[in-house]
Regions:
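Short helix-perturbing small/polar motifs within transmembrane alpha-helices
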Residues: 15-32, 50-52, 124-181, 224
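Alpha-helical transmembrane segments in multi-pass membrane proteins
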Residues: 42-53, 89, 93, 104-112, ...
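Membrane-embedded alpha-helical hairpins and interfacial helices in multi-pass inner-membrane proteins
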Residues: 60-78, 121-122, 157-237
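Hydrophobic transmembrane alpha-helices
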Residues: 2-105
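Interfacial aromatic-anchored transmembrane helix boundaries in multi-pass membrane proteins
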Residues: 55-81, 107-151
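Peri-membrane helix termini and adjoining interfacial loops of integral membrane proteins
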Residues: 14-22, 114-126, 193-199
Length: 237
């Protein structure tokens, strides 16, 4: 927390609540309907981006992965996959802010109930929770999907406060978003698969740590660079 807090004081009051997403859709804000159209467009674009990153295949050491989002019980421990979807979720949250990030990730979650937009082309309520042999059962990936919504909202709120305008704040915001995803996803996976804590961490956390480090580094570059390009870097006009 202390890493980003000192910089927040530099953010002008008029800048708070503005995210980099406000510069992405060229629709005038003058009239109320135009503002609503801009927000709606950003929410839909964010949901589409999350869906696309859910199905980006990552190739490492000659093997292809489509993780995370599709965190399978049979996930190999090695080689460690570099993931795409969690970065997409956190990117959308940081770009759109609290409400739009929350709604965008939520829209993606709802779309996946009927359309094959979850990782690996999965879809349906059973991915989150369903009936198995007459009993309710949790889907192994359901916790991660729900965690995406919370993470997008949290990262979005931090972006509204200006954390993403400098390297330290962007990295910390993304780190907190990742932690939230794990806090929801790992216990859910443990219950769904009958894992103990050690196995849950081995299957649901450790294989993604290298990818997480890469995401944090990329986020620490992308967001401050984007703010610099629009002339609002580090909270300055």
């Amino acid at each position: 927390m202390t890493l980003a807090a000192p910089r927040l004081n530099r953010l002008p009051a008029g800048e708070r609540g503005i995210t980099i997403g406000d510069f992405l859709v060229p629709i005038a804000i003058g009239e109320r309907i135009s503002e609503r159209a801009r927000h709606a467009a950003l929410i839909v674009i964010g949901a589409v981006l999350i869906a696309l990153t859910a199905n980006i295949a990552i190739v490492l050491h000659g093997q292809t992965f489509t993780l995370p989002g599709d965190v399978r019980v049979t996930l190999p421990v090695s080689p460690v996959p570099i993931t795409a979807q969690t970065f997409g979720v956190l990117l959308v949250g940081g770009a759109l802010g609290f409400r739009r990030g929350l709604m965008s990730a939520g829209l993606y979650l709802v779309l996946g109930l009927a359309l094959p937009v979850y990782a690996g082309g999965a879809s349906g309520l059973h991915t989150i929770i369903g009936r198995d042999a007459g009993h309710w059962a949790l889907g192994a990936t359901g916790g991660y999907l729900l965690g995406f919504v919370l993470a997008a909202a949290i990262v979005g709120r931090l972006a509204e406060l200006g954390w993403d305008r400098h390297v330290g704040g962007a990295v910390v915001a993304m780190l907190l978003g990742n932690v939230v995803i794990y806090l929801v996803g790992v216990p859910w996976l443990m219950v769904a698969a009958g894992f103990d804590l050690t196995t849950g961490l081995a299957k649901g956390v450790y294989p993604f740590l290298v990818g997480d480090i890469v995401k944090l580094a990329v986020a620490g570059i992308i967001f401050p660079a984007a703010w610099w390009l629009v002339g609002r870097g580090d909270g300055t006009r």
